[in-house]
A protein has these predicted regions:
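ATP-binding/phosphotransfer module of carbohydrate and carboxylate kinases, centering on a glycine-rich
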Residues: 1-3, 17-27, 49, 67-158
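Short glycine-aspartate micro-motif
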Residues: 30-34, 40-42, 72-74
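Active-site glycine-centered loops adjacent to acidic/histidine catalytic or metal-binding residues
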Residues: 10, 36
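A short, polar/charged loop-to-alpha-helix boundary motif
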Residues: 56-69
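General beta-strand structural signal in soluble alpha/beta enzymes
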Residues: 4-9
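Short, acidic, Ser/Thr-enriched surface-loop or helix-capping motifs
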Residues: 44, 55
Length: 158
């Protein structure tokens, strides 16, 4: 017998998996967000993957969350979520913060990565906490807007 194989974007496939067997089980509408070196997402509407006209329907990393940003994102726009909520975005935020002031922080003593920033947060490092708050602020903006656009309602049992 012949088995068919389909290939898809990692975030889209993750969203399908969550809908079929995970946190989205039993729901026909959901948004899955993936955070890594970039920010991706899979959007499922009425049980179907939203792929968009050019196959980039779930590229939520390029939602604009900061209209005052002066640096360009890799896509050419400014203020994209990926500039703040990806691993590379967290490093960018940290390097910018370290260059702007002389505050004492363990981040000056090691190569900055998303992991070192969040490890420093666990150690109550004030600079790392500020960076994490900025990360969370922009991720929160995007998630709130995605929830509103998807027609979701807040869960009361959190």
């Amino acid at each position: 017998s012949c088995t068919s194989v389909k290939v898809g974007n990692d975030a889209n496939v993750a969203a399908l998996g969550e809908m079929w067997k995970g946190g989205g089980f039993g729901h026909k509408n959901m948004v899955m967000v993936t955070l890594g070196t970039g920010v991706g997402g899979g959007i499922i509407s009425n049980g179907h993957m939203v792929v968009g006209g050019h196959g980039a329907g779930g590229e939520i990393g390029h939602i604009c969350v900061n209209y005052e940003e002066t640096e360009k994102c890799g896509c050419g726009n400014r203020g994209c979520l990926e500039q703040y909520a990806s691993a590379t975005g967290i490093v960018r935020l940290a390097k910018k913060r370290l260059a702007e002031n002389d505050d004492e922080t363990v981040l000056r003593n090691e190569e900055v990565s998303a992991k070192t920033v969040f490890d420093a947060v666990k150690e109550n490092d004030a600079v790392a906490i500020e960076i994490a708050k900025e990360f969370g602020k922009y991720l929160g903006y995007a998630l709130a807007n995605l929830a509103a656009a998807a027609g979701g309602r807040p869960r009361r049992n959190l």
